[in-house]
Amino acid sequence: YEIVTCYRNSKNFGDSWVSAGYGLWFLREAKYLNASRMLLGTSCAISGTGFMFSHRILEKRGGWHYFLLTEDIEFTADNIINGEKIGYSAKAVLYDEQPVKFSQSWRQRMRWTRGNMDVLRYYCRRLFRGMFKGSFSCYDMLMCICPGFFLFGFGVAANAVAIVENMTGHGSW
C-alpha cells in the first residue's frame, strides 16, 4: 500500500464521557471498519491525522490540493476515485487529544458535517460513477460520507412508486 492509515486512539480517554466516547468511536472505526475492509481487500478510509502516503502519490496528484474542512475524507475520496487502495496498520497507533466538553464536541462535529457535505458536493458524481463501474470502495465511501441521504432518497422513491401504483389502481393495498 502507498497510503496507510493507523489506529487513532484517544490520549485523554478518562477525562470525560465525551473524550471516552471519541475513544470508543475510534476503536469502532479501527476494528470494525478499517480492519474489516483490509480482510475484504477493499480500501480503508483515512480519519484524522494518523496516516502516511508515498511521495509518488503526492507527485501523481500534482501536490497537496485538499483544503476542505475534512481534508482527510477529501484525500480518501480522491484517491479511491483514482483507483488507489488505502491500507490499515493496526500496529501504528496515534494518540490524539479529544474534546472533553460537549460544546467543544458539538462545534467540531458541526465542522465535520459541513466538511462531509463539501466533500459530497465535489466528489459525489465521481464516486457514484465509480460505484457503477464496479468499485466497491466508491460505494463504501459514499455510504461513509452520507448514509442518511441515500436512505432518504430510497425512501422517497419507494413512497413515490407506492403512491403512483395506488393512484393508478395497480397497488394491492
Question: Which residue stretches match the model-derived regions?
Answer:
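Catalytic cores of eukaryotic secretory-pathway lumenal/extracellular enzymes that build
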Residues: 48, 88-89, 95-107
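Basic/Trp-rich segment in TM-proximal cytosolic loops or flexible interdomain/linker regions
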Residues: 40-42, 100-173
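Catalytic core and acceptor-binding pocket of nucleotide-sugar-dependent glycosyltransferases
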Residues: 50, 71-72, 141, 146
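Generic beta-strand/beta-sheet core signal
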Residues: 6-7, 89, 97, 144
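Long helical/loop segments within the catalytic core of UDP-sugar-dependent glycosyltransferases
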Residues: 1-68, 110, 117-121
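Structural detector for helix-capping/boundary residues
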Residues: 55-56, 73, 92
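Catalytic donor-sugar/metal-binding loop of nucleotide-sugar-dependent glycosyltransferases
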Residues: 41, 67, 76-95
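Short, hydrophobic alpha-helical packing/hinge segments within bilobed ligand-binding/sensory domains
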Residues: 75-76, 105
